Structures are given as C-alpha cells and as structure tokens.
Swiss-Prot record:
This is Lipid scramblase CLPTM1L. Its main location: endoplasmic reticulum. It comes from Pongo abelii (Sumatran orangutan). The lineage of its organism: Eukaryota, Metazoa, Chordata, Craniata, Vertebrata. Glycans are attached at residues 91, 101. The keyword 4Fe-4S does not apply. The chain crosses the membrane at residues 11-31, 285-305, 325-342, 347-364, 403-423, 429-449. Keywords: Apoptosis, Endoplasmic reticulum, Glycoprotein, Lipid transport, Membrane, Transmembrane, Transmembrane helix, Transport.
Amino acid sequence: MWSGRSSFTSLVVGVFVVYVVHTCWVMYGIVYTRPCSGDANCIQPYLARRPKLQLSVYTTTRSHLGAENNIDLVLNVEDFDVESKFERTVNVSVPKKTRNNGTLYAYIFLHHAGVLPWHDGKQVHLVSPLTTYMVPKPEEINLLTGESDTQQIEAEKKPTSALDEPVSHWRPRLALNVMADNFVFDGSSLPADVHRYMKMIQLGKTVHYLPILFIDQLSNRVKDLMVINRSTTELPLTVSYDKVSLGRLRFWIHMQDAVYSLQQFGFSEKDADEVKGIFVDTNLYFLALTFFVAAFHLLFDFLAFKNDISFWKKKKSMIGMSTKAVLWRCFSTVVIFLFLLDEQTSLLVLVPAGVGAAIELWKVKKALKMTILWRGLMPEFELGTYSESERKTEEYDTQAMKYLSYLLYPLCVGGAVYSLLNIKYKSWYSWLINSFVNGVYAFGFLFMLPQLFVNYKLKSVAHLPWKAFTYKAFNTFIDDVFAFIITMPTSHRLACFRDDVVFLVYLYQRWLYPVDKRRVNEFGESYEEKAARAPHTD
C-alpha cells in the first residue's frame, strides 16, 4: 500500500500530467481552424481576387475619426503587396496637446489603390495609441560628484513630487500584420478571436471577408519608450509590416488578450512587459518548448518546497549542518529580494524570491533553535543549547568561515568602493543594495564552502536534504533556460549558472562519501533498522 506521502506526491504528478495534456489540447484548438467543407455558408477571402491595395497611416489626437480634418498622413505605401515584408522609419509631428500629456493615435487604413480611405467602402482600418502613460525612470547619478549622463530638462522645472506622476511616453514602433492565408471560413463556426477582426461584404451570392489587418501590440516594449517633453516637436516612428498565418494570428490574439487581462488584474505596464518579452523575443517553437520547461519547473518547485519544508520541520539537530551556511543563505536571499524590488523586476521573478526569503528566515529560526517570547508588543529571542556533536560541527563551521573571511571581505569592500567611484545609482540605498547583491552573486558560492568543509571533515553527506536538493538541481538547470528568456538583471542571470557548479560539487561529494546504511540519521533511525522492523499485525 502506498504511504500518505507517496500518494500525495503521485496525486500532484497526476494533476500535473492532466494539466499539460489539457493545455496541449487547448493550444491545438487555438492554432487549428476547421476549413469550410461545402459551398453553403462559406466565407471566401477577398484577397483571392488579387485587388490592388494601398496602405495609409495617419495620426490624430482624436480617438474617433469622424472626417478627414485635423489628421496628418505619415506613411503612404502605394501598390501594397501583402506578401512583401518591409520596415520604414518616419518622423511624426507631435501636437501641442500631446506634448501637454495628451494622447496621439495612429489610424492604419488598408484600402484600394488610388482611392481615399473614407471614400472606399471596402477599406479596413484599425486604431492604435502611439503614446502611453508611465512614471519616468529615476535618473541615475554619481553619488560622490552628483553628475549624470543625461539631464532631464523638464525634471529641472518640476517639483520632486511631480516626478512620481505618470507622463506621456512615445511608442517608437508600430508593427502591422495582414493574414495572408487564402483560408475559407465556415460561417457557422467562425472562431470568436478572429471574428472581431473580420469585416464581411456580399459580392453576388458569395460572402467575402476583407483583408484581416492586425496590430502587434506585443512588440511595444517598455525599454523602447521615450519621454515626451514639452520641447519635443518631432519623434521617430518605425512602421514594420509582415504577413502572418492564421494559426499564428490566432495565437497572437490570445496572447495579447492575456497580457491585457494581467493589466486589468492590477499588473503594471512593466510587469506585463516582462510577459511580452517571453513571446516577442523568442522563436515560436522555442516558446512551445519553454512552456513544457516552465511546467516542469513549476512541478519541481512545488516538490522541492514540500520536501525542504518537511525536512526542516522534522529536524531537531544541527549535526553535520553548517549553521553559517544557513545564515548566509538567509542573508543573501533577503538581499536578492530587496535588490529585485529596487530594480522593479517583474512579479514573475519577485514573488518567488520573496517566498524564498521567508522560508530562509524560518530555517534560521530552526537552525539557531530560537524561541520567540512576546512581552506585550516587544519580542524576546532565546537561543537553544547545542549537544557535544553539534558543537563539533560548529567548530568545523567556524574554522571554515575564518579562512573564508580572509578572501571574501576584502573582495566585497573593494567591489563596493569601485562601484561607488565608477557607477551611477539612483540613491545611496540603491548603491548599498547593489553592493551587497554583487557580493552575493559574485562570491556567494564561496559561502557554500563551510558546508562542503563540514562534509569533508565528517566524511558524510547523509545529513543533507537530498530529495529537496535533487528537485532544486533540476530547477537550476531549467533556470539556465529562463535566464535567456525572462528579462532580469545581468548579475541575477549569471547567478543561475553559478548554482550549476555548486550542485555539481555536492553530487561529487555524494559519490565520494556514500551513505552508510547502518548510520543513525538525524531522526534517530537507520536504514537497516527500518528494513528489519516488523509490520503491525493488528
């Protein structure tokens, strides 16, 4: 019979498999569209008639275009070919209303060549804002000299409180697509996602759908945005075009809807931008692989979390465990969380880091045998006593830290002084957190040496939570994949590869010091005792 723990793990794995299969089925339903099988109720593509088309892009400050007044033509592509990819950069005049925190819209028309858009009954058009509102990025300065790379003219005129208010930012890219497949839709089962982009006309006895025009909003990244100052009169706009297949179009529509839903649920523009980066900066096939990798990452995260908590919850002794390594992991995890918070990193990275910091704080409480007593609103901390075996482990631990400090502290202090002299920061707090985190990332693996030293002196690794380590080892290699996909600070990205080395060293020690099955573990049990224990007969 399965134990309760095994049954729970099997249940989690089973739910995970069902989730992956269901997601694959949903994705198949998105990219595959059943064509019309008969002549009745079929909707034919207008592009199959090979019409001569023209692409026109206008700008205006009005969200609803009633007439051809007060609009500016910024791009006109005559003899527009749906199959031909292009990219053009134009200068757009910025009206006074837009410079005063107003909005500027782009109207994209696809119409018959030689006919004005508003005189063409078979034209299709879409509207897209060319501006968005965001709080300007804080200016970075040299903390010693006060110098900055760029001085914001408008910032000098505004009070400090006004710098935290959202201002208009320019979107320098406008990515356009037209569905180029001559696909015949079944009118009785039109996909809802594509239907809202379709415009139908009656030609004789046949219903046709006009060219499906699509604006790729996922290509608008926060890193490309430009602040619009009151002195700005012209700004560059790069208009790009490429054809798109029906399957990719439907997938892209769903992804845009998902990003929009995140913003409706309270995600900031920057958080949503991190999700955009996964789709825009990644090949579609690699993206599919990433989905499966992410699913396994989620599974291993849960299993590692479950086994790690279970291990530390039952642990009563610190024999063979480096207390200094536990303290360091707690300090480094908290510093990394504060650094990611200061860098305004995506919630996709920030939330797991925060949960990890809370768990490490709890581990410190267990490692120090700490008891918290409340005297009114003031807490008092009492530390437990160590046994003779634990004091021996602590002695090895202190010895390792003594040698390590000779190398580590000068490197960290030197790095902090160098960054203060040569790198610009938003504030002294930002410099302090960056100095700490650079020390953690650059030399953090050195703090794993005390645990490795304790393992060496005891000639044993049986006291380590190997099941949790195994799941974490899988995840650290998965993190290597995500390091190239999700936007994050470079130092955090490099730390993912550093963890690979740490786990390889642990695996080497596990091979070097095989577990003695007669040895009593930290729970007072040995493998041979459990094997010889008679089952209950009642």
